[in-house]
Amino acid sequence: MSEPPRAETFVFLDLEATGLPNMDPEIAEISLFAVHRSSLENPERDDSGSLVLPRVLDKLTLCMCPERPFTAKASEITGLSSESLMHCGKAGFNGAVVRTLQGFLSRQEGPICLVAHNGFDYDFPLLCTELQRLGAHLPQDTVCLDTLPALRGLDRAHSHGTRAQGRKSYSLASLFHRYFQAEPSAAHSAEGDVHTLLLIFLHRAPELLAWADEQARSWAHIEPMYVPPDGPSLEA
């Protein structure tokens, strides 16, 4: 198996959606932070020595009104509802969203590595479903990194698989608290979770960059979460 291409830009991604995978969810919010590799290799710190987000950073956050209703739990966790999104005049995941995403990604130096926490089980398959419904694609050399198995794998290597390591929680909130002794802000908003994810990545940047270089998965190998119904064309 050949190694993935060395990514020059890392695009940190989070989705908020209408429910869990078994509910055939639809995306209601997406947020992306694009960071050049050089900014991850040389993290910035404030006067107190605390990690801060890179100064050169592209952001994109979009809300959209899905056709499927939110589960009660998803609405409670995300603070989003079909009613609030409709009231604010938000369309669904359509051709305009795809063109915006593609334009955002085209501004970044490639190859691009998409980064999400639990991405292989949720964010990447769901994004793949929405894109497939519209017949849309990402750049062919795009790769993906899921920080959940990556951080577990790195810790397992350091601890030699001890029982204590197996009891650790790897939720975003638990990782952030473990690394920074604080609670993350704006949890379960897409942008808030991407902010948290990027700081977690910066805390382990050398190891995670090396992991990505060796084990990132090609976007072409991501399977959709479910077979989407026929939707509107990209002209929508």
From Swiss-Prot:
Subcellular location per the Swiss-Prot or TrEMBL entry: Nucleus
Domain of life: Eukaryota
EC number of this enzyme: 3.1.11.2
Cofactors (names): Mg(2+)
Entry keyword Methyltransferase: no
UniProt binding sites for substrate: 16-17, 122, 193
Main location: nucleus
UniProt cross-references to SMART domains, sorted A to Z: EXOIII
Catalytic reactions on record: Exonucleolytic cleavage in the 3'- to 5'-direction to yield nucleoside 5'-phosphates
Gene Ontology molecular function terms on file: 3'-5'-DNA exonuclease activity; double-stranded DNA 3'-5' DNA exonuclease activity; magnesium ion binding; nucleic acid binding; protein homodimerization activity
Active-site positions on this chain: 188 (proton donor/acceptor)
Keyword Metal-binding listed: yes
GO CC annotations on file: nucleus
Keywords: DNA damage, DNA repair, Exonuclease, Hydrolase, Magnesium, Metal-binding, Nuclease, Nucleus
UniProt-annotated binding residues for Mg(2+) 2: 14
Protein name: Three prime repair exonuclease 2
Organism: Mus musculus (Mouse)
Primary gene name: Trex2
